[in-house]
Amino acid sequence: MSQGFKTEADVMRNTAHRVDDTNQEVSAELSRLRSIVDGVRASWEGTAQVSFDNLMQRWDASAKGLQDALQSISDNIRGNATSFENVEADNQSAFSAVGGQGLAL
């Protein structure tokens, strides 16, 4: 028998924080690589340099896309944690409203 899906809001927020950390690490590494690559730009001339510049524009767009995707994942996880807490609070209120009267069946 399946145990189902279980989670807690604090676990979700911790996961979102880990995604943020990963995003920062990826950003730092991409910046480091970009600095290295920028150092060889001067070795290209003419149409080769134009091609190189076009390639680097695509690199920048892809890097931003990756960073945006990681940020979106983190934001979604945080939003889900808040929704999870709200549903839990609503459920608790609903059960408390029944109180000692039991269910009218």
UniProtKB/Swiss-Prot annotation:
Biased composition (Basic and acidic residues): 7-21
Segments passing through the bilayer: none
Region of interest: Disordered: 1-23
InterPro entries cross-referenced by the UniProt entry: ESAT-6-like_sf, T7SS_ESAT-6-like
Pfam families on file: WXG100
Lineage: superkingdom: Bacteria
Subunit structure: Forms a tight 1:1 complex with EsxB.
Further comment: To improve expression in E.coli the proteins were cloned as a single protein in the order esxB-esxA with a cleavable thrombin tag.
Entry similarity comment: Belongs to the WXG100 family. CFP-10 subfamily.
The protein's name in its UniProt record: ESAT-6-like protein EsxB
Source organism: Corynebacterium diphtheriae (strain ATCC 700971 / NCTC 13129 / Biotype gravis)
Organismal lineage: Bacteria, Bacillati, Actinomycetota, Actinomycetes, Mycobacteriales
Gene for this chain: esxB
